[in-house]
Amino acid sequence: MFTVEYSEGGRTTIRSERSYVTLEFLLQPIYFPKNGQTVYYEALSSVISDSGEHLNSEAFFETINDEFIKTVLLLQMEHFSQSNSISQDILLNVNLSSLKDDDFIESIIKRNKSNKYHIEVNEIDTPVRDVKILKNIKRLQKSGIYIILDDYYHENEIAHLSLGVIDWDYIKIDKSFLLYNSGNDDCLKALIFVISPYCKNGLIIEGVETYFQNEFVKKYNLLAQGYYYSRPKNIFKEN
């Protein structure tokens, strides 16, 4: 079990019997490059040290269990629901295995009365044909929640196995694609041709960090995310 403490500036401290961690909840926009509009936000968590420094959040989240991840997701829903300034929907990160938990699914649906939140699966850590997971995904989608595959790249065999099994609403293309293929229209066209049939609403390409990459991506009907548009921000500090 975890206890939660709130502090000024949008920071949240989560405690267990033996340890605690302070998180700052951030939002990073997802754009439609053709018109420059923000379509969604992705919710991210930054780990804060006792001295107030930002630590390596990616390394931290690789060491924690599903219960903590589920707690963070529900806290993010509560946190961002306090703001009236966010008109776009928000994507929340979770492991696929967390979607086995019926009580967790029920909590998400109950908290999503505004139909503002969607689920981004950032790690496939359990068999994709798990009957309970597939049932719960359909339940979430029936309630209006999108299910998004994160960090797709051609060498991710587990992600490949999910295509055609999980009915993805969006697929996010890992930032490594742009790193090695910026300007290669044939490569991007081939990717779109192969992957698009496996998602209902389209692709989101990550890692847009330069003007050149943005100009390359905006020729296509893709959503995009990256530091070129914005770094993750604390919207409560911004306002």
Task: Locate each region found by the language model.
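EAL-family c-di-GMP phosphodiesterase catalytic domain
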Residues: M1-T22, L26-Q28, P33-Q37, S46-G52, ...
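Bacterial c-di-GMP phosphodiesterase EAL domain
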Residues: F2-N112
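EAL-type cyclic di-GMP phosphodiesterase domain
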Residues: I48-L74, L96-Y146, E155-N156, K175-I195, ...
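Short glycine/proline-enriched coil/turn segments at helix->beta-strand junctions
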Residues: Q82-D89, R111-K116, S143-I145, D167, ...
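Buried hydrophobic side chains on well-structured beta-strands
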Residues: I90-V94, I119, I171
